[in-house]
């Protein structure tokens, strides 16, 4: 199997001052192309360290994706490190220099002298175009390893990987068939509870079951070779059966996006009233393009379940909305949810059975509970669902 590695560069990445989202994205993207990463390394802005690790990995990896260090400043050292590792000098790429000058001219700016550095590449390097920025990429062969050097800006990095690097890999290597990966996301059951129920299932050869916990959800993932796809799809039916009503969506699209599409398909507008969640519902749904008619965040106040239900019923009528959803304030470990629909208003009062989670996590959980309540109504299910540490203590329905 092709041995593919990644090297992230930069003091800010090494010291944890920024999250290395490029590494996470590349690992996931390459995995789904049949190119799982075998190793990831991070090195700061130090020329000797960069040269050392380039020479070291050139003896072990078939492909190395180097990210960052192609900018115009003194701490951008990737091109010089590559040239030094090969025992070569840097040469000016005249065509890219002219492209950069055009880039700045079209934007009414004068290119700074320091940008000239971005057109200096190791001698004999293969130029890689950057259609969305000033940092071109390049490729060099060092010992057994084909190395690709890419910009650190995420939008530029992703374009270069997808449109420049992956096609080159497909031309030069015989790539394996991408694996099959089936995913679903659950809400309300613990990871250990799910694992206890699912670990009894017999997996086909080469197939693995994975769990990823990210409060307030747990993702289940069945991964295996394409040759086992039929067996995996049959097993997937058992996985969904065992996970039961805790399943909130399949795939990677996310619950807000799926709710947004369902609202649009059924021509429902939605109005929101939030206290404890502080606008989190509005943020998630607006980012997914949901048909939001009106959103408000109001100061937290103690309310009975009946008060919350009547308030959101009136709000739906006043805004001529298809649906209206409310999350009350959080008082004495209790919280109200209410959903006003054409069929009536459905409300729940819940109690948190633990206090060990932070405010941010509790808000995320409550936002997910509200979204799940909406999802269940749209699917024709009862709005209440089980949750490991949240208990429904009261429910009510207001008829139309």
Swiss-Prot record:
SUPFAM superfamilies: CinA-like, Molybdenum cofactor biosynthesis proteins. This is CinA-like protein. SMART domains: MoCF_biosynth. Belongs to the CinA family. Coiled coil: none annotated. Signal peptide: none annotated. InterPro entries: CinA (IPR050101), CinA-like_C (IPR036653), Competence-induced_CinA (IPR008135), MoaB/Mog-like_dom_sf (IPR036425), MoaB/Mog_dom (IPR001453).
